[in-house]
Amino acid sequence: MLWIWAVLPLVLAGSQLRVHTQGTNSISESLKLRRRVRETDKNCSEGLYQGGPFCCQPCQPGKKKVEDCKMNGGTPTCAPCTEGKEYMDKNHYADKCRRCTLCDEEHGLEVETNCTLTQNTKCKCKPDFYCDSPGCEHCVRCASCEHGTLEPCTATSNTNCRKQSPRNRLWLLTILVLLIPLVFIYRKYRKRKCWKRRQDDPESRTSSRETIPMNASNLSLSKYIPRIAEDMTIQEAKKFARENNIKEGKIDEIMHDSIQDTAEQKVQLLLCWYQSHGKSDAYQDLIKGLKKAECRRTLDKFQDMVQKDLGKSTPDTGNENEGQCLE
């Protein structure tokens, strides 16, 4: 009976040793497998890419990858890019093609070479426009010279105009010096005459503020949106949308829906803001939004349009006399 108790510890120790050995072997096999995977990643020859467990050939220009290859050195399943909308100009293994560049006619650009499956669109400045920076997205209208041209405008440089002679400048300065006091005297005379007329005619005392409503909070902006968009670049329209809390996903959706029509993209970006904002206080908030997006030129034109329309829409019998007093 005593020999059983003596042998039992030896049996248990042997069992634990076998379990430990099996666990060590399992870890060793896992490390070997990982090492083989890493070696497979590094074993792809130059020009091949790792597609699952295999080294695959890239897709050719004008195509995109649909599925990886099924054997080492094999060719993946590739599909052509969308003609006229997408391109790929080199060997690759991406599952998407690049989008073709659009030439914005509203900003002086026109197509030089159409987009193909293997080449992006090439844009150039329209006649009488130029751009002096690389990767140009906005061409500028060539200057017109009042005193003659030294060098004509080209696609990459503005017109070089002949400068005005010092003698002409002296004449101009003299005229300005004489005109300034005359204008001052004339304006003072008109104000005095206007004040007297208003005193004599009670009906004409109506303030000009009544002819142009002070509160434009409920002014409908629907008819102004296309005219505002026409004056903005697509970058300014996108910046306006971002600065006024339009989500990036919605901006991308609008850009994709009208991918070939820059003018429509700009209109839809502004309409998206207007629809989400509502009519109430839209006039004041649009002005704030344009300032925030640094669209000063567009803001000035918009205010001029509204001022002009409001002036026409409010007839008044005293307008003629009052208009002369606005100076």
Curated annotation (Swiss-Prot):
TNFR-Cys repeat boundaries on the chain: 43-79, 80-123, 124-162
SUPFAM superfamilies according to UniProt: DEATH domain (SSF47986), TNF receptor-like (SSF57586)
Molecular function GO labels: calmodulin binding; identical protein binding; transmembrane signaling receptor activity
Compartments reported by the entry: Cell membrane; Membrane raft
Ranges that cross the membrane: 170-186
CDD domains: Death_FAS_TNFRSF6, TNFRSF6
Any one of the GO BP annotations: gene expression
Residue pairs linked by disulfide bridges in the UniProt entry: C44-C55, C56-C69, C59-C78, C81-C97, C100-C115, C103-C123, C125-C139, C142-C153, C145-C161
SMART domains in the cross-refs: DEATH, TNFR
Residues the record marks as carrying a glycan: N43, N114
Keywords in alphabetical order: Apoptosis, Calmodulin-binding, Cell membrane, Disease variant, Disulfide bond, Glycoprotein, Lipoprotein, Membrane, Palmitate, Phosphoprotein, Receptor, Repeat, Signal, Transmembrane, Transmembrane helix
UniProt modification remark: Palmitoylated. Palmitoylation by ZDHHC7 prevents the lysosomal degradation of FAS regulating its expression at the plasma membrane.
Phosphothreonine: residues carrying this PTM: T206, T314
UniProt membrane topology term: Single-pass type I membrane protein
Gene Ontology cellular-component annotations: CD95 death-inducing signaling complex; cell surface; external side of plasma membrane; extracellular region; membrane raft
Disease listed for this protein: Defects in Fas are the cause of the lymphoproliferation phenotype (lpr). Lpr mice show lymphadenopathy and autoantibody production.
Subunit note: Component of the death-induced signaling complex (DISC) composed of cell surface receptor FAS/CD95, adapter protein FADD and the CASP8 protease; recruitment of CASP8 to the complex is required for processing of CASP8 into the p18 and p10 subunits. Interacts directly (via DED domain) with NOL3 (via CARD domain); inhibits death-inducing signaling complex (DISC) assembly by inhibiting the increase in FAS-FADD binding induced by FAS activation. Binds DAXX. Interacts with HIPK3. Part of a complex containing HIPK3 and FADD. Binds RIPK1 and FAIM2. Interacts with BABAM2 and FEM1B.
Protein name in the entry: Tumor necrosis factor receptor superfamily member 6
Protein species of origin: Mus musculus
